Swiss-Prot record:
Annotated family: Belongs to the universal ribosomal protein uS17 family.
This protein's name: Small ribosomal subunit protein uS17
Subunit structure, as described in the record: Part of the 30S ribosomal subunit.
Keyword field contains Signal: no
Function: One of the primary rRNA binding proteins, it binds specifically to the 5'-end of 16S ribosomal RNA.
Biological processes annotated in GO: translation
A cellular component term, taken from the record's GO annotations: cytosolic small ribosomal subunit
HAMAP family hit by this protein: Ribosomal_uS17_B
Alphabetical UniProt keywords: Ribonucleoprotein, Ribosomal protein, RNA-binding, rRNA-binding
GO terms for MF: rRNA binding; structural constituent of ribosome
Length: 98
């Protein structure tokens, strides 16, 4: 078994790819899982009309911190299950807060 010193671990951490992070609203909760709806704005290439697309992501929420209506930040991670490939990073804003 190979032992790694701190320098090689730091180098590995620096070369690791950045994970995709998204922000969205929680639309459904269940134990350790939330469904987050992410809205992105696009511009049509030919007609230059702006439009919005919405996509839903199943997200892992280990501590059950998020509730329906919360604005959250999620990050891409290894596959946790068949449909879960994101994890909850933080709750940016609770439902009742302004």
């Amino acid at each position: 078994m190979l032992k790694m010193n701190n320098l090689t671990l730091e180098k590995k951490a620096q070369t690791r790819n950045l994970r995709k992070t998204l922000q969205g609203i929680v639309i459904r909760t269940s134990p350790k899982t939330i469904m987050v709806e992410v809205e992105t704005a696009y511009k049509h290439k030919l007609y230059a009309k702006r439009f919005k697309k919405r996509k839903k992501f199943n997200t892992h929420d280990e501590k059950n911190l998020a509730e329906v209506g919360d604005f959250v930040k999620i990050a891409e991670c290894r596959p946790i299950s068949k449909t879960k490939h994101f994890r909850l990073v933080e709750v940016l804003q609770k439902k009742g807060e302004i």
